[in-house]
C-alpha cells in the first residue's frame, strides 16, 4: 500500500491572515500600555442578516485589560502624572464595579503606583482576584447606602473615608473626570470613523459613567457627522431620569447621574432588562462566536428592537461598541442555574 502525501489547500482567508501577521512585526509595542486601543471591528453578519442592517462590533475585549475601561484608566492616569496632580508617593483610591478597577490596576502595576479599589458585593470574585493579582488592594463595601439604597453611593462614601485617612490620596473620579470621556473622543470614536467612514448611521453605546457616551457624542458633534448616537441604559438606572430599581448585572447603568452626563448626548435612548442582556449575549456567542460581557448583550437586544420598530432600516450601517469580555460573566450571564434562580425558571425559554 502506497502512502501518498496529502495535498494542502489553504483555507479561505488564511493567506490574508498570515500576511497581516507578518506586517504586524513592525507594530511591536514597547509596553503593554501601548497596546491599549486600536481594537478590531468585525461585521456581525450572521446575527443581523435578516434585518438587512450592516452592524459592526468594536471588540473592546481585546484591550490588554479586557475592556474599554483600559482606555479611560490609561488616559486619566497619564494626564494626572503629566500635570503633577498625581505623583509616585500618592495612593490612588477609586470606586468601581470591576472593569475600570482592572484597567487602573493594570496601569498602576506597570507604573509602580499604589491603588485601593472600592468594590461592592455585586463585584464578582473573579474580578476581585484579577484586581488583586495586579497588586492592588481591594476594599469591599457590603451594604448599600442607607439613604439611597444604592451600592454606588456607599462606595463613594467609602472612597472619601479612605482619602481622608491616607497621605497624598488621589481620586481619579471616573464619573466626572474629563479625561474619561477624552479617551473616547481621542481614540474610540476616531477609530470607528476611520474604519467605517464619517457617514456611519448609528453608534450604539452602553451607559454607566457616561465617559464613552460623552466622548463619542462630542466627537460626532464637533466633526459635523450625521451619525445618531444610541444610548443603551439598564432598567433601574437613573441616568436618563427614570426611578432607581434593582439591577443584577454590574457595570451597566448607574444609581446616580454622572457629572459627565449631558441631556443632549443621545439621539435615542433604549432601556434594557437584565434578561435582555443575558439573551443578547447568548445570541452573540451562538451566532458570531463572540463571548462578550453583559452590556454587549443589551446592545444586541437594543439593535434588534430598533430594527423591529423601523427606527433602524435595511442598508443602514451601525457601529456597536462591545465593551468587555464574557469570561467575567460565566457565573452569571452564561450560567443557566444563575439565570433561572435570578430571572425565573422560564427565562431561557423565551
Per-segment meaning from a language model:
Residues 1-350:
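PLP-dependent amino-acid enzyme catalytic core
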Amino acid at each position: 500500500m502506497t502512502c501518498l502525501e496529502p495535498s494542502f489547500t489553504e483555507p479561505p482567508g488564511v493567506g490574508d491572515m498570515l500576511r497581516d501577521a507578518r506586517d504586524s512585526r513592525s507594530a511591536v509595542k514597547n509596553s503593554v500600555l501601548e497596546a491599549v486601543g486600536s481594537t478590531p471591528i468585525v461585521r456581525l453578519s450572521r446575527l443581523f442578516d435578516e434585518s438587512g442592517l450592516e452592524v459592526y462590533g468594536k471588540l473592546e475585549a481585546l484591550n490588554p485589560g479586557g475592556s474599554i475601561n483600559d482606555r479611560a484608566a490609561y488616559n486619566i492616569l497619564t494626564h494626572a502624572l503629566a500635570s503633577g496632580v498625581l505623583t509616585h508617593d500618592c495612593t490612588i483610591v477609586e470606586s468601581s464595579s470591576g472593569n475600570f478597577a482592572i484597567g487602573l490596576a493594570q496601569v498602576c502595576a506597570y507604573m509602580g503606583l499604589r491603588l485601593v479599589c472600592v468594590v461592592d458585593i455585586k463585584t464578582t470574585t473573579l474580578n476581585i482576584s484579577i484586581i488583586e493579582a495586579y497588586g492592588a488592594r481591594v476594599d469591599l463595601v457590603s451594604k448599600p447606602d442607607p439613604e439611597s439604597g444604592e451600592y454606588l453611593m456607599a462606595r463613594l462614601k467609602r472612597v472619601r473615608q479612605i482619602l481622608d485617612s491616607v497621605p497624598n490620596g488621589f481620586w481619579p473620579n471616573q464619573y466626572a473626570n474629563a479625561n474619561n470621556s477624552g479617551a473616547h473622543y481621542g481614540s474610540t470614536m476616531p477609530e470607528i470613523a476611520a474604519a467605517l467612514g464619517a457617514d456611519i448611521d448609528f453608534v450604539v453605546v452602553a451607559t454607566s459613567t457616561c465617559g464613552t457616551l460623552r466622548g463619542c457624542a462630542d466627537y460626532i458633534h464637533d466633526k459635523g457627522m450625521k451619525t445618531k448616537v444610541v444610548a443603551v441604559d439598564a432598567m433601574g438606572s437613573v441616568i436618563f431620569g427614570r426611578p432607581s430599581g434593582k439591577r443584577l448585572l454590574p457595570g451597566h447603568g448607574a444609581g446616580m447621574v454622572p457629572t459627565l452626563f449631558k441631556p443632549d448626548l443621545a439621539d435615542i435612548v433604549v432601556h434594557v432588562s437584565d434578561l435582555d442582556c443575558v439573551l443578547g449575549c447568548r445570541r452573540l456567542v451562538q451566532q458570531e462566536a463572540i463571548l462578550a460581557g453583559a452590556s454587549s448583550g443589551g446592545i444586541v437586544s437594543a439593535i434588534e428592537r430598533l430594527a423591529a420598530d423601523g427606527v433602524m432600516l435595511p442598508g443602514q450601517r451601525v457601529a456597536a461598541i462591545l465593551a468587555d469580555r464574557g469570561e467575567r460573566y460565566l457565573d452569571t450571564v452564561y450560567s443557566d442555574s444563575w439565570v433561572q434562580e435570578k430571572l425565573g425558571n422560564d427565562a431561557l425559554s423565551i
